Amino acid sequence: MGEKLQFTELDQYLFGQGTHYDIYKKLGAHPTMRGRKKGVYFAVWAPNARSVSVVGDFNEWDIQKNPMQKTGPIGVYETFIPEAKIGDLYKFYIIGYHGEEIYKADPYGNEAELRPGTASRITDISSHKWKDTTWMKHRPEFNEKKSPMAIYEVHPGSWKKHEAKDEDDPGFYNYRELAHELAAYVKKMGYTHVELMGIAEHPFDGSWGYQVTGYYAPTSRYGTAEDFKYMIDYLHRNKIGVILDWVPAHFPKDAHGLANFDGTAVYEHEDPRQGEHPDWGTKIYNYGRPEVKNFLIANALFWIEECHVDGLRVDAVASMLYLDYGKKDGEWVANKYGDNKNLEAIEFFKHLNTVVLGRNHGTVMIAEESTAWPKVTGKAEDGGLGFSLKWNMGWMNDFLEYMKLDPYFRKDNHNKMTFSMTYAYSENYVLVISHDEVVHLKCSMLNKMPGYPDDKFRNLKAAYAFMLFHPGKKLLFMGQEFGQLREWSEERELDWYLLKEEKHQDLQNFVKTLLHMYTKYPALYAADNDPEGFEWINADDSYRSIFSLIRKSPTKRNNLLFVVNYTPVDRPDYRVGVPKKKQYKLIMDENGLLDKPKIFKAEEQECDHREYSFNYSLPGYGVAVFTY
């Protein structure tokens, strides 16, 4: 073809080994120069294709005009097209292994046509001029084990919406608008991070972004790749970290996507018992194939290094770890040892986390893992998977079951609130109340609470207070901070009008107070992984459904004593055991921060197996926070 090839022998070797971590800078579509000619370099991996060409706006989608050249045995095709330019739509036209004609979007494309269109769009992903220098300079210093993490989980398409211009207008905010409104709200509330759902390009709104076709493309629903980078940049300049949902567990069968990419199983396993999720109707990646592993690991690095994202929340980890996940007998293939562990996925996680965290100090890899798989956050070299943090699904299930109970029955389920402390230090945990808990007839957080409307609000405040004082980082899905009544739907914005009502505003202010307290007091975060940082005062007062505990600061200053009542019964003379004979300052109760702290002096009266104690008038559903 005459032009200088960009995919070198070294590229071939590294890609074949699964260690070409910058592969996205070679594969895909890249505006560049050939001598004095401006144009676009295209490269795609299609190992079993008979031929590949590029079709697009620049050649009137003519399959004959721009054939690609196969560069070597690994199966990468490439070409340079002077007529192609930024903004043009394109696809790869493939004659498959069996002679079939296939049109595919670019697996490494950085922008996509707005759905229902399925083409890729040429862009210059490196054109953004970053202004988050201060954030990035200090990012390597971040230590998630000793730092506060209060994460606001957000679905960008439904957090807020514009009024629709017509029936086809979804009213989405642009990434830039989101940046400004989100930053202002998150800062005001006291969150430290946002976790964004559905950023990678996906064809179906109702999948919430969990069936991805464009792993390297921020979804065009909210603007361009440049707009997306602006949002990250702006959030960083406002001292807000950004975590993305990331889905390496499976991919959809859409014709333009990764499935049967060149007429054969390229990204997935060929055997449907290994390559299909029957429950989800999706394909499973072949984690043992170096080029596939490379595609995914480089994708994680793309978001973190190219887009400055601060961490990834890895979806559906359990589905990757178990070969029989969601499958009946005969629908799966055992590993070489005859059991159900996916050895290739285990090695993939170790490789992924070692590379991502090794190259990017101060970032986090978070596992959504719903089983008791050991050492999810253990070091890879010690046999762990190497994640930074793991969602604490066990705590969440027990906590929500308890909170949904009528207060009369809580005394018989007291252990649901205490059991999590028996394993709290087995992993590095995030306590989560995610989008999954407020959909599919599960009710919003407010409507999970028992009783009349007033009781629901009081219960929810007590619930959030307990969550804040339990060891672990925090995640709360959008809308639950102000008492969203309806379940979440991706089709409509949150019910912000509820904030015109005093009770919703009061709940929002209470959550805001909790979050600002969380970031102010190291006792609440600096010893999350140290058993010395937590002490039950009374974990056994099941009859009255009252819990009392202490969170300790590593400096031994500004420790916090927390008491909560999960019945509507007032306890005017509730005696609390304390560790020392000193003054305890009440700084917050169920109504929020006190204008002036109240002093309680410990007396030499035994209570809760402690030498000292004091009396406190604890209201029904009351919360009390003391510092000492």
Spans of model-derived segments:
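A short acidic, glycine-rich active-site loop
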Residues: 217-221, 336-343, 452-454, 498-505
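Short catalytic/ligand-binding loop motif for oxyanion handling, primarily in non-cytosolic enzymes
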Residues: 101-102, 160-162, 202-205, 250-253, ...
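Soluble or luminal CAZymes and related metallo-dependent hydrolases
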Residues: 174-178, 227, 291-296, 341-348, ...
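Conserved alpha/beta catalytic core and glycan-binding cleft of carbohydrate-active enzymes
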Residues: 308-310, 328-490, 519-529, 533-576, ...
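Short glycine-biased active-site loop of nucleotidyltransferases that positions the nucleotide triphosphate
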Residues: 69, 204-209, 253-260, 377, ...
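Substrate-binding/active-site clefts of carbohydrate-active enzymes
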Residues: 113, 136-146, 155-341, 608-610
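Carbohydrate-interacting/catalytic domains
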Residues: 1-148, 176-186, 190, 454-457, ...
